[in-house]
Amino acid sequence: MQRFKAPSKFIQYQLWSECRNGCLFCLCRDQILIDKKYALNFILDKLDDEEVYEFDEVGLIGGEIFDVEIDEPEIKELFYKVLTKICSMHFKKIYIATNLIYDMDKHLVECLEFLRNKGVQNKVLICTSWDSNWRFSTAKKRETWESNMRRLETEYPDFNKHIEIILSGDFIDTVLAGEFDIAEFSKLCNARIDFIEPTSGWYYNDKKQLQAVCPNFFPTKEKFIKFLKQECIEKRSVDIKCLISNEIRSSRRYQLDCGQFVCQSDRRVEGFQTVCLDPEKKFETGFIDSNESIEEVCIALCEMLDYE
């Protein structure tokens, strides 16, 4: 079966790991905090590298960016230097990741107006995340996210939106039980949805350690196959070609690991595996009861059902 092929190449820069939301499953949880002025100057320098001309899309990711992270005037000034530089460059698309669990008026609105004034709003993709459990630890947080999504739709319709959802066991349960309709959610949010496999990240040693903290975070293989049959084969609410493709992710990312910038140079190659600087961190993905990858299971099911 053919995988989804991205029409362009995408370079992404992590600014920092700082974020107040405190998701227990976050792959950046409790990472070493980096000096934000150093990080922003590092990215300004990287944007001068000739390598950027290999890519026609660019992205910025935290941590979080627009909650309290750029409160300090010097940090904010440097952040806007980065944005100004990006806006002046050759990039056809600009990805900006944010959790949307904060007061938009503090920083995000100013940033969106800045991007509008630069005339790049049609290039910008606001990337956020939704999860059935552990992300919204209070009802207030969920309401804030939903309110901000509605506000983006009404006040900033010229900015496209994108949502990532982790294929956790909990999420799959809500879908299989009929408590969450993927197609309706996408329509309600007016946003493209992509699904990513759960990972133990840079904080936990392995899947079992994270599963003990967030029960049902990693799905069983059997449960995932039921989800595939229902949502990919029968309802076609999920594009299986994207599930088995690394090309929905950035091609190259400057990622923080143990307080250091690490270049993940070709994340779209088949079989790409994140390797942590801390040898105890396995960065495991997939199922709690199998070492098979989500990709392998998707392909095997498609072959068995002769699905194109």
Task: Give residue spans per PLM region.
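Radical SAM enzyme [4Fe-4S]-AdoMet core and its adjacent flexible, acidic
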Residues: 120-269
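Canonical Radical SAM [4Fe-4S] cluster-binding loop centered on the CxxxCxxC motif
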Residues: 1-42
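Distinct, well-ordered alpha-helical segments
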Residues: 71-81, 104-116, 139-141, 174-182
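Leucine-rich repeat
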Residues: 45-52, 81-87, 114-118, 184-185
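Short, intrinsically disordered, charge-biased short linear motifs at domain edges
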Residues: 6-14, 240-252, 281-291
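Core AdoMet radical
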Residues: 30-38, 54-75, 88-105, 119-147, ...
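Flexible mid-to-C-terminal extensions adjoining Fe-S/redox cofactors in radical SAM and related proteins
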Residues: 250-308
